[in-house]
Curated annotation (Swiss-Prot):
The gene is rbfA. This is Ribosome-binding factor A. It is found in: Cytoplasm. The keyword Cytoplasm applies. Its main location: cytoplasm. Keywords: Cytoplasm, Ribosome biogenesis. Gene3D superfamilies: 3.30.300.20. It comes from the Bacteria. It holds the Pfam family RBFA. Belongs to the RbfA family. It comes from Synechococcus sp. (strain WH7803).
Length: 140
């Protein structure tokens, strides 16, 4: 098996097991103060380091507490991953906050605001598909 495929397979297994541990294995109350989604798992080629990117749905204070709880649980998580995946040496786990979903929601909110402003000015009729209207003038 190519080294890249093994790294991908280990990353997928780490994602699955970490998800299970977040739901049922970690007892730290800080971790359960928000909705956590694992967005990406990056494992180094030598399988010694693992970055787990998470999105946390909570207020800023709750998000900070969740991240503190995850960092505190990382050594427990490393041990559990080593045991569950039967790895001789489990990778060192570091959690990173992924703000991609947050930024996406912000962009969608801004686009919604822009559409409402355009409707108020009468530039586009309510409920119309602006993209479709742009192509109506083109010849077939």
């Amino acid at each position: 098996m190519a080294p890249g495929r093994r790294v991908e397979r280990v990353a997928a297994l780490i994602r699955k097991e970490t998800s299970e541990l977040l739901m049922h294995g970690i007892r730290d109350d800080r971790v359960h103060q928000g909705l956590i989604s694992i967005t990406q798992v990056d494992v180094s080629g030598d399988l010694q380091h693992c970055k787990i990117f998470v999105s946390v749905l909570a207020d800023p204070e709750g998000r900070a507490q969740v991240m503190e709880g995850l960092q505190a649980a990382s050594s427990f998580l490393r041990g559990e991953l080593g045991r569950r995946l039967q790895m001789r040496r489990a990778p060192e786990v570091v959690f990173h906050l992924d703000r991609g979903l947050e930024k996406g929601a912000s962009v969608l909110g801004l686009l919604g605001d822009l559409e409402r402003e355009r409707q108020e000015r009468g530039e586009i009729p309510p409920g119309s598909d602006d993209a479709q209207n742009c192509h109506d003038d083109e010849p077939s």
